Regions:
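Two-component/phosphorelay signaling modules centered on CheY-like receiver
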Residues: 10-35, 41
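Acidic, metal-coordinating helix/loop segments flanking the phosphotransfer/catalytic sites
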Residues: 29-62
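Acidic catalytic/metal-coordinating carboxylates
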Residues: 32, 73-76
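Active-site residues of response regulator receiver
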Residues: 66
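The feature encodes the CheY-like receiver
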Residues: 70
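Alpha4 helix (beta4-alpha4-beta5 surface) of REC/receiver domains from two-component response regulators
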Residues: 76, 96-114, 122-126
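CheY-like receiver
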Residues: 134-172
């Protein structure tokens, strides 16, 4: 999993780095909103130069944003990223009260995920790795190794799961 994280607290950035390295994920971190956007736009441009325009390749599997970061805050960063790439997976990781954060991100008009700080390591990694989605797909008899090899994006996995749920509801 390749993750871009915008976090102003140096100790927290270090924690993310250790955590993601431990689970063999790739982390690129930014200390503020401007740096995050610069990294995101650079990576998006590099991908566009290397791939066919019809392919929907994401520069990052997830972008994790602290709600309050210097310069442009997490909400502004999310708005700009989603404006250029509406399929990008965004996760807000914040110590803010969940209700306040949910109200703020509602204005994005896009599905974003929230994780409350402090979070436990397993919860965060499972969220990044779509562990719960894979568990549910396996209940439908799907071969999880085949699905992982196909390297579906988070959005595609959720769409597959949604279709399977709807098919299960239909009368035979």
């Amino acid at each position: 999993v390749k993750v871009l994280i915008a976090e102003d607290n140096e100790d927290t950035r270090f924690y993310y780095d250790l955590l993601l390295q431990k689970h063999r994920h790739i982390l690129i971190s930014a200390k503020d909103g401007e740096e995050c956007l610069r990294i995101y736009h650079d990576e998006l441009e590099n991908i566009r130069l290397r791939t066919d325009a019809t392919q929907k390749i994401q520069p990052f599997d997830a972008v994790v944003l602290d709600y309050k970061i210097p310069g442009r805050d997490g909400l502004e960063v999310a708005k700009e990223i989603l404006a250029v790439n509406p399929h990008q997976r965004i996760i807000f990781a914040s110590a803010y009260v969940r209700d306040i954060l949910m109200e703020a991100v509602r204005h994005l008009k896009q599905l974003v995920e929230l994780v409350q700080k402090p979070f436990n390591e397993r919860q965060f990694i499972e969220m990044l790795e779509d562990t719960e989605v894979y568990r549910e797909l396996s209940k439908f008899g799907m071969d999880i190794n085949d699905i992982k090899q196909a390297q579906f994006r988070h959005e595609q996995l959720n769409n597959l799961l949604k279709v399977l749920r709807e098919l299960r509801k239909r009368p035979k």
